[in-house]
Design a protein with these regions (language model features):
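C-terminal outer-membrane beta-barrel translocator/porin domains of Gram-negative envelope proteins
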Residues: 242, 390, 394-521
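Outer-envelope beta-barrel architecture signal
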Residues: 261-263, 273-277, 289, 303-307, ...
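Bacterial N-terminal signal peptides that target proteins for export
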Residues: 2-15
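Transmembrane beta-strand segments that form the barrel wall of outer-membrane beta-barrel proteins
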Residues: 220, 275-285, 293, 297-299, ...
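Solvent-exposed loop/turn segments connecting transmembrane beta-strands
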Residues: 283-290, 311-320, 345-354, 384-391, ...
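Periplasmic polypeptide-binding modules associated with outer-membrane biogenesis and secretion
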Residues: 29-42, 52-285, 294, 308-326, ...
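Outer-membrane beta-barrel strand-turn architecture
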Residues: 271-273, 299-301, 328-330, 363-367, ...
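Transmembrane beta-barrel wall of Gram-negative outer-membrane proteins
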Residues: 320-393, 397-399
């Protein structure tokens, strides 16, 4: 295909655009400065980006460099649609012969080149694919000042979409940006033939991983024979990596291995060490110094079962727990966990020893909410103040929902967490009391200008019972502490009896808002 001379010249070396948020009237690159007249911050920035730093040149050397410097400025302005700048220059001699001479360039941008026509045609099956057309850039549009960066982005986006959606045989039939500086006009023509969309074949796991194939197949969320999408491959790799079973995951779905437009998916897995131990020492204003430790067996059989033990020791609270977990389908989100634990706690006027044995079923709904159905048997011995020791035995079925949305799993700058939990017990079902317990909470985080963080919390709860004195401390409400009401001791706020002993509340309503400023990262 033959292109006019002005098109060939415009394709040379134009296409870097470095845009800064602050502008300056002139750029000083060693012995060379450039100033774009008028209110053209983008042109000024691009001229600065293209200008080479020159040092150690004599006055004669600077004169020889003028044509090179003017060429750099012209290239920078062409990239943003200004093909006919007027560039004046002068050599500035230092006063008293102190310091080197300076080459000063002054630029009048002139009249810009405008987009006169835009023809973008996607031929083949991709032309009728909403997923392809939805993400095509709208820029540049007819009437815009020509921006080579936008043209390149449009062209590159078409190629990227084809690769992402599986149109691997796609190619440009016409790819032309015709610029006529005399008419100050540019014509864009992009004709892309997509070819047929590839499909994904069967997933094969290379032997040696030690797991049941039936378990691994539950990580595959796409159907064999379905259309290719790179996100499907990325999700499979991510889910396997985040499962906790493997130290490395390699998912191969290269188009070159396709047969008849169907790409086989081959997965190579390296199993992680089965066990890990972690421990740590910390301090919080709620419980003071504390010691934490956990032991975890990440997989104990080919079905992917796992188990672990955890403990936390501090002056007011000591606990230990063990658990055993079975993955369900899909194993990324769904599981059944059996657990048992013992906790001893002494805070202000309340002493408690709590033994818990139970089961949890976790299931993620299509809406993104995590649903948890549980049933726990709890035996608690407790005492308020100097009173006598009481004991409760409760069988507590429960249902909970939680939702977490955040822009990062590790250090979020904004997001929220919502939860609702309902549990209950009845004397007719192996329990010492009739209880309905409801607790809802909401947390929100929002960051402004990187360093200013706003954190809000809200907790609402209630206990319905015909005899509140039978409700153990673990099901009553207390407030106070870093995660509740700052300025008060941990769980020291509650209704009191005539002797000033905190008894815990039947209802809870706690809200707070915090402002945090980050001085250094």
């Amino acid at each position: 295909m033959q292109h006019p001379p002005f098109y060939k010249s415009c394709r040379r070396a134009l296409f870097g655009l470095f845009v800064l948020s602050m502008t300056a009237p002139a750029c000083l690159a060693g012995q060379v400065s450039v100033e774009v007249k008028g209110d053209y911050p983008a042109l000024q920035d691009n001229a600065e980006a293209f200008m080479q730093e020159i040092e150690g040149r004599s006055e004669a050397g600077l004169r020889r460099y003028v044509s090179t410097a003017k060429g750099q400025v012209q290239t920078a302005l062409k990239a943003l649609g200004y093909y006919e700048p007027v560039i004046d220059w002068e050599i500035l001699k230092p006063e008293g012969d102190e310091g080197p001479a300076q080459l000063s360039l002054t630029v009048e941008p002139g009249k810009p080149v405008l987009v006169r026509s835009r023809k973008v045609e996607i031929m083949g099956p991709a032309g009728d694919d909403p997923a392809f057309n939805l993400f095509l850039p709208s820029k540049p549009v007819v009437g815009d000042v020509l921006d080579h960066g936008q043209y390149n982005a449009l062209r590159q986006t078409i190629q990227n979409l084809a690769s992402r959606l599986g149109y691997f045989d796609g190619k440009f039939l016409t790819r032309r940006l015709a610029v006529n500086p005399e008419e100050h006009a540019a014509d864009i023509t992009l004709e892309f033939q997509s070819g047929e969309r590839y499909r994904l074949g069967d997933v094969r796991f290379i032997e040696g991983h030690g797991f049941e194939t039936s378990l691994l197949n539950q990580f595959v969320t796409f159907e064999s024979g379905g259309v290719y999408h790179s996100d499907k491959i990325a999700k499979l790799s991510s889910d396997l990596s985040n499962s906790g079973y493997f130290s490395s995951v390699d998912v191969d779905a290269t188009p070159s291995s396709a047969e008849g437009g169907v790409i086989p998916v081959v997965v190579a897995l390296r199993t992680r060490p089965p066990r890990s131990i972690a421990g740590g020492v910390g301090f919080s204003t709620d419980v003071g110094p504390r010691l934490r430790g956990n032991w975890r067996e990440h997989w104990i059989n080919p079905m992917g079962h796992r188990r672990g033990a955890e403990t936390e020791l501090s002056q007011p609270r000591q606990n230990v727990s063990v658990w055993y977990e079975l993955p369900l389908d899909p194993p990324m989100t769904d599981s059944i966990r059996f657990s048992a634990g013992y906790q001893q706690e002494e805070i202000e006027d309340v002493e408690s020893q709590l033994l818990t044995v139970g089961q949890q079923w976790n299931h993620q709904l299509d809406s993104g909410w995590l649903q948890t159905a549980s049933i726990n048997w709890e035996q608690e011995r407790y005492r308020f103040g100097d009173g006598s020791t009481d004991q409760s035995r409760l069988l507590l079925p429960g249902l909970g929902y939680s939702l977490l949305e955040a822009d990062s799993a590790f250090d979020p700058s904004k997001g929220y967490h919502l939860s609702l939990e309902v549990t209950g017990a009845h004397r007719a079902l192996l329990s010492d009391a009739d209880i309905a317990h409801v607790l809802a909470s909401a947390k929100g985080l929002y960051t402004v200008a990187d360093n200013h963080r706003f954190l809000t919390r809200l907790r609402v709860g209630a206990v319905a019972t015909n005899r509140f004195s039978d409700v153990p401390p673990s099901l009553r409400f207390f407030a106070g502490g870093d995660q509740s009401v700052r300025g008060y001791g941990y769980e020291t706020l509650s209704p009191e009896n005539s002797e000033g002993v905190g008894l815990g509340g039947r209802y809870l309503l706690v809200g707070s808002m915090e402002y945090q400023y980050e001085f250094a990262k």
